[in-house]
From Swiss-Prot:
Keyword Acetylation in annotation: yes
Modified residues (N-acetylalanine): 2
GO BP, sorted A to Z: rRNA processing; tRNA 5'-leader removal; tRNA processing
Quaternary organization: Component of nuclear RNase P and RNase MRP ribonucleoproteins. RNase P consists of a catalytic RNA moiety and about 10 protein subunits; POP1, POP4, POP5, POP7, RPP14, RPP21, RPP25, RPP30, RPP38 and RPP40. Within the RNase P complex, POP1, POP7 and RPP25 form the 'finger' subcomplex, POP5, RPP14, RPP40 and homodimeric RPP30 form the 'palm' subcomplex, and RPP21, POP4 and RPP38 form the 'wrist' subcomplex. All subunits of the RNase P complex interact with the catalytic RNA. Several subunits of RNase P are also part of the RNase MRP complex.
Single GO molecular function: RNA binding
GO cellular component, one term: nucleolar ribonuclease P complex
Stored InterPro entries: Pol/histidinol_Pase-like, RNase_P_p30
Domain of life: Eukaryota
Source species taxonomy: Eukaryota, Metazoa, Chordata, Craniata, Vertebrata
Record protein name field: Ribonuclease P protein subunit p30
Keywords associated with the record: Acetylation, Nucleus, Phosphoprotein, RNA-binding, rRNA processing, tRNA processing
Amino acid sequence: MAVFADLDLRAGSDLKALRGLVETAAHLGYSVVAINHIVDFKEKKQEIEKPVAVSELFTTLPIVQGKSRPIKILTRLTIIVSDPSHCNVLRATSSRARLYDVVAVFPKTEKLFHIACTHLDVDLVCITVTEKLPFYFKRPPINVAIDRGLAFELVYSPAIKDSTMRRYTISSALNLMQICKGKNVIISSAAERPLEIRGPYDVANLGLLFGLSESDAKAAVSTNCRAALLHGETRKTAFGIISTVKKPRPSEGDEDCLPASKKAKCEG
């Protein structure tokens, strides 16, 4: 059975409202959620805060509907970048950013989108859905992002609220799918209220409207989310998985086949 995730529940100052979001997600069958703290350096006095502690939200975690285990609550940081200087905090992951399980970047220009895909130390690249896409997607940076293990995130709650945003969301999604062909796409709610969250199978059906195949749409709320979380774990520890192969020593018969220089070293 698939493990479903919603990696964008909007963090606010109201902890009671945040609890309601998490409880609703668990009731709908999500096993993993991420509480999203958003920073826009274009606004004054913006800084990266410490993530919300799970212990502040719940003494006992809600049980996932249809499962016998509690929901897993992770933390996420999203940086909105509208100027190249905003990227500095994400080039070599800052100590504050490393406190978060997931780090996302929301680039506002084509140049910043290219930088995000090719250089920034993040897990997710957010796609604009609340306004007309300010640039066209190009294949080279998207292919680099896929090779680096980054995921592209589309959010659906704006499409629920407003018909104009619904058009923007579908248009942005279809433009993205033309290039990435459904690879490394995740779909999140960006919910601020419980009524804005939809069940994982409803979200997968929504993915069909976004141009995803049936299997890619399901992956967008399950396996692709898991891959993004594993990418975040690697980023936080700054170590990948290293595979070592022990080189066998040459046998006496093999030494006759060695070049003269290497044979001399072996004899020495």
